[in-house]
Amino acid sequence: MKTYIVIFTTLILLISCEKEDFNEGNIRIDKELIMQLNSKSYDTLIIESNKLVLDAYLWRDFMPISPPDGKTMISINWLRDIDSTEILDNIGLIEQYVIYNDSIWIAEYENETSTTQPDYKIKKRSREGPKWGPNICVDVISKICDSNSNNDYYIKIKDIYVERTD
């Protein structure tokens, strides 16, 4: 009987423990990582002759061909020079972090290039995100690489509304 009580108590304790770092695919619950990302990211970033900001558009598709609970999130990010100066070739968008409460969607950008963007913008897309929202606000942080210096930088934009497309 004592064995059952010990096993039962142990199970209860394990189940009730708070999970600080939960991973599900590319979605994490990690308050510490969110604090680290926020502490090293900037609203405006200056790299050589470029003064850069991040723009973002996120949505979930609820078109009739979509599942009843909608498709996963899609994100488009633009790195933009605020003076419309051509962005140097050594600067690139590498990875994005979409933050909602204590959860983070971490995604590398798709390997597509846009020929329709002006020289002062870089456009990158990520798919297969979480099914958060729609009609919520998230923060977006992007990891940028400067291949000349081999330095990574982080740039952010806050309170981006996640749209619903029908």
At which residue positions do the language-model features occur?
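Sec-dependent signal peptide recognition
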Residues: K2-F8
